[in-house]
């Protein structure tokens, strides 16, 4: 509105109307007399307004009319239940009803319409949604809601049902969900169920659902190149388990199914001793031909280029080839030297050779197929020593040059063939020092320091940059992030995280940087977020199942694993894996040791079994 008067004087608005003659009117003793109109802003030419309450209020009132059966112009007869409604509302929400009521169908002229092949409870929930925009999808109703939503062409409800089923996937039900998705043409759900089935085939093949599969669906599954198996023996064993579940009806399909088992990829011993000697296989001529084909492939290596086909093509399981190492950490009141290896293919943790020193707060990275353990704290002293592990020999060597500073709670990563050590603390102060190791020269050299001192910092490499994420400046946890450009030897700040985090886990996954867990000013965290370098923004993802400070984070064969940590009351040995398709974490086993502040590294699986460590060859603390 108008300006407020100031300093006790009275200001006359410029638009005030003044009465009198000539603009100055004098009366009586020469006093000035005037009349001032009320001050108003100029009238706008138009005033636009959109009510945020109107849609909700209108729907609420329409729903009240429906419930009181007022102004309803159609009754839906579903399974003997009568549902009163308004044609215009149903037509606006559903293409099915729009076609029914606006076309030339007989129903367009009827006041009572019978709807067949739909569950009455599902119909009532969907009509409620049309009037309220609210629905609850749960295990007890999703199998009737989804078909009903498909029939009524309520795409939003279809998507919600599919999202719910995606979150329910596990090895015991994924085949049923896959079939359900296929029946109702839910392509995205079918794709994800297929992917889940392929990825978890070793567990799926043990389920009752697998034994009940129709032959066509079995073939669809086992013919996939993406089937995740340790060897083709597992596929053959799965097929024979399925066959023997109902031999009388299924033996006629054996050759049809066996042609999708890649027999030429079996070991000669298994092919001859197990497949070739099986009575069901031997009794079928087409099956015998498949076995002979595989024998020829194995016996005539010089002819193999001429024998290539679908059965000679190795499968490409997403998990094959990489293993995760958990290194050092804090357990049972002391730093530990133990190291263990996780194989996602078998879901097993195995002990390997321990380091020569106990190390908590150790930085771990893989360079040239060798695992480096940098610095840390041995329970008494801060360390600058380095150890290097060779998985082929299962041995640690200590001939790596030490860092120029002692460092624990240090971030370590590999960029352009150099090993970088970032931040940490040396027992006196929190560090912003950064140095890098040249394996050809066996030498460390300093590069530009960070702009902020950081201990408990997480580091990641993406797009040719080295990122330093969170940590603590020695006083409080940080949410700031900076990145190093090796071309200009310079650190630059980027967008901060939404949460302050020290001792967090960090990894690059699908071109995002994921930051999980850690500790803020008050407590250990389960929350997680990810950074998009293209938009320079952080966005939240679903929280982990446990709070985890001092957690390790790594990508193994295309899956993101969170390893160990501290939940505020106990050291953890559990691990969990993140599925970006469903935005869910799930627990997937335990390490042999509880580990806080251990390092993690990912390597190609060794070619031999010489890396296995005898678990009783050294004393283990309580795990």
Swiss-Prot record:
**Do you know which InterPro entries this protein is assigned to?**
BACK (IPR011705), BTB-kelch_protein (IPR017096), BTB/POZ_dom (IPR000210), Gal_Oxase/kelch_b-propeller (IPR011043), Kelch-typ_b-propeller (IPR015915), Kelch_1 (IPR006652), SKP1/BTB/POZ_sf (IPR011333)
Q: Which Pfam families match?
A: BACK, BTB, Kelch_1, Kelch_KLHDC2_KLHL20_DRC7
Q: What domain of life?
A: Eukaryota
Q: Which SMART domains match?
A: BACK (SM00875), BTB (SM00225), Kelch (SM00612)
Keyword Repeat in annotation: yes
The coiled-coil segments of this chain are none
**Protein name, UniProt field:** Kelch-like protein diablo
Q: Where are the Kelch repeats?
A: 323-369, 371-417, 418-464, 466-511, 513-558, 559-605
- Where is the organism placed in the taxonomic lineage, from the top? Eukaryota, Metazoa, Ecdysozoa, Arthropoda, Hexapoda
Q: Which residues carry this modification: Phosphothreonine?
A: 19
Residue ranges constituting the BACK domain according to the UniProt record: 174-276
The annotated phenotype of a deletion mutant is: Defects in synapse differentiation and growth; undergrowth resulting in reduced numbers of boutons and/or branches.
Q: In which pathway does it act?
A: Protein modification; protein ubiquitination
Q: Where is the composition biased (Gly residues)?
A: 20-32
Purpose: Probable substrate-specific adapter of an E3 ubiquitin-protein ligase complex which mediates the ubiquitination and subsequent proteasomal degradation of target proteins. May have a role in synapse differentiation and growth.
**One example of a Gene Ontology biological process annotation:** proteasome-mediated ubiquitin-dependent protein catabolic process
> Where is the stretch described as Disordered?
1-54
Q: Which organism is it from?
A: Drosophila melanogaster
Citing just one GO molecular function, the answer is: ubiquitin-like ligase-substrate adaptor activity
Ranges of residues in domain BTB: 72-139
User: Which cellular component, as a GO term, is one annotated location?
Assistant: cytoplasm
- Check the UniProt entry and state the signal peptide residues, or none: none
